[in-house]
Design a protein with these regions (language model features):
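Accessory RNA-recognition modules of RNA-modification enzymes
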Residues: 1-337
Length: 337
């Protein structure tokens, strides 16, 4: 049977891609990628696009749900492009990711007799992120929207409270929207390159509790910055830093090269593996701090350093990995290009 657009086929999902689509095969062996499906699903699928050896489809009906399928805990799932696995259990997500690693090593890498240890899973699967970048735009009716981009697009899905972010981030967005309305702040249009406010970039120190709010603008600043600071300070006692980042380039890169602090410090602090670090808008910092501590601890265990050894931390960036091991060696040397 020749597969055509809008054909309806029955599929059993047998595997998954890195982007979260399930994969099933037709009776003719053609792979069909179905977003929002789960391994084990028996589905009625409408074909959306046909290529030479594969096709894309969407779920018309779930005939028999996978045992791993759960009710998504976010109303924006399948609209927002941020998450791919909210419709399956975390245990199933880890299982899929483990299988992808094993396939990469054995099938692609061609290595045999490799022992794979189980994934070290995260204790927290919600509210664990310490940074978010919210694009700001206008919908078709001219209303201000902030949130995250739709899957494979630059269409902003309005999201007032992402369950991966601390709840305080949602309050920052609400205050900022109030400020935009009061001051009639122009919103950046990436198509024309005109407008002022591009992104709202928020960081928090999980241990310190310190909050940084950075506004990315297509200008040198915002109008009535004093009012903005006053509005933020009045409701956010943990506010440590408010920064204006200028990005006048017509680019997908979020941050420009120039920062200007309009309140407080130019950085916040946080703690990783007992060490305190300063974090600016430009700093690389692990998004999931607690999981990073597990990762670094395991790396330190595998390194099995001796007190008379010199540790080279190559392409070290901030140097967090090496610094967390410095107490176990004679000398630490970090190198960054």
């Amino acid at each position: 049977m020749t597969l055509k657009k809008n054909d309806i086929v029955n599929l059993t999902i047998t595997s998954a891609t890195a982007e979260g689509s399930g994969v099933g095969r037709t009776d003719d062996g053609i792979a069909v990628f179905v977003q929002g499906s789960a391994i084990g699903d028996e589905l009625k699928v409408r074909i959306l696009k046909v290529k030479k050896t594969y096709a894309f489809g969407k779920i018309e009906e779930i005939l028999v749900p996978s045992k791993a399928r759960i009710t998504p805990d976010c109303e924006n799932f399948m609209k927002c492009g941020g998450c791919t696995w909210r419709h399956i259990s975390y245990e199933e997500e880890c299982k899929i990711k483990q299988q992808r690693v094993e396939d990469a090593v054995t099938r692609i890498g061609g290595l045999d007799n490799v022992v794979f240890k189980p994934i070290i899973s995260s204790d927290n699967i919600t509210r664990y992120r310490n940074k978010a970048q919210y694009p700001v735009g206008l919908d078709r009716d001219g209303n201000v929207v902030t949130g995250f981009y739709s899957f494979h697009s630059h269409r902003i899905i309005n999201c007032t409270d992402c369950i991966l972010q601390p709840e305080i981030f949602a309050r920052v967005i609400e205050i900022t929207k109030d400020f935009i309305a009061k001051t009639n702040t122009e919103i950046y249009d990436e198509t024309t390159g005109k407008g002022r406010l591009r992104h709202i970039y928020i960081r928090i120190g999980e241990v310190s509790g310190e909050l940084m709010v950075c506004y990315v603008v297509n200008a040198n600043g915002l109008k009535q910055e004093d009012l903005l600071v006053k509005m933020l300070k009045s409701e956010l006692p943990q506010l440590k830093s408010v920064i204006i980042n200028s990005n006048r380039e017509k680019t997908n890169v979020v941050l420009g090269r120039k920062n200007r602090t309009i309140y407080g410090s130019d950085h916040i602090t946080d703690t990783l593996c007992g060490l305190q670090f300063k974090i600016s808008p430009f700093s690389f910092w692990q998004i999931n701090r607690k999981q990073a501590e597990k990762l670094y601890g395991k790396a330190k265990e595998y390194a099995n350093l001796k007190s008379d050894e010199i540790l080279l931390d190559l392409y070290c960036g901030t140097g967090t990995i090496g610094l967390t091991m410095a107490d176990s060696c004679k000398q630490l040397i970090g190198a960054e290009i």
